[in-house]
Amino acid sequence: MWVFVVENKTFGNRAFCRQVEGRQQFGDYSQEALQDLIRWRDIWAPALRAALRQIGGLSLKPIIARALQMGDELHNRSNAASSLFANAMAVPMMEAGVPKEALISTLDYLAGHELFFLGLSMASAKATADPARGIKYSTVVTAMARNGTEFGIQVSSLEDEWFAAPAPPVKGLFLPGYSEKDAGLDMGDSAITETVGWGGFVLGGAPGILSLVGGTPEEALSYSREMRQITVTTSPEFRIPALGFEGTAVGIDVRKVVQTNILPVIDTALAHKNPGHPIIGAGLVRPPLECFKKALSRFTEKYGLN
């Protein structure tokens, strides 16, 4: 299966992502769901590869910065980023000589897929976070992930150790035909976006997502302000217009999380507890505090700070 490769040119590391869709990756293996994977393999991915080779690659940082100022939070709302990516691919696909039918099919796919950029934002976040690993004495979180059973975090100075606790339920809104009783516990790798200060951290600049995850614009702004209390800095490159163009909060510090009892806020999709279903809704969730307490305890043990 084709993947995108995202390279951090400053540090030379890479991350990758698959096609994002709302059916098979949530456990729906119907023929209809699999058809999108087949079209990705045979039509859409080859067309996009031709375009990217035509222009020698595409810089994602400008797209991300613009999208954040256009109402995206780059986790469950990537409408602007997906459109900007589609615009960037249109002419190069034509210049690369992509056959007309494949060109039209790929453009139609991009135009109708508002969540397309999520895979690229996840890979960008991963490529951004990985160079922060292995820094002595650092208590900055470098990964957050969930598997429907456990929620785990990794911390810079503790390198590849995982600190896990039971995965929490997600509070949110459900698509027609589904309810709380159908939902599994929090799961997925997409919280890597919050790890670098996107997603729930920038809800204040993405009020459009509230119709999907629930909440009010005032609450969204309060989440973005609250995240500043548990992070080490703000981004000089990614800014939120609704907060006076302040930079996004970045660098979750396990010490601050434990000291304040403020947990990172994550907006996330809801998966069914049983296989055979597409996405069933979306909402907000916070990691278990126990993850951060375990990490801080290990940190003090490692560096003899008891």
Where are these regions (language model features)?
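Anaerobic metallocofactor- and corrinoid-dependent redox/one-carbon enzyme cores
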Residues: M1-N306
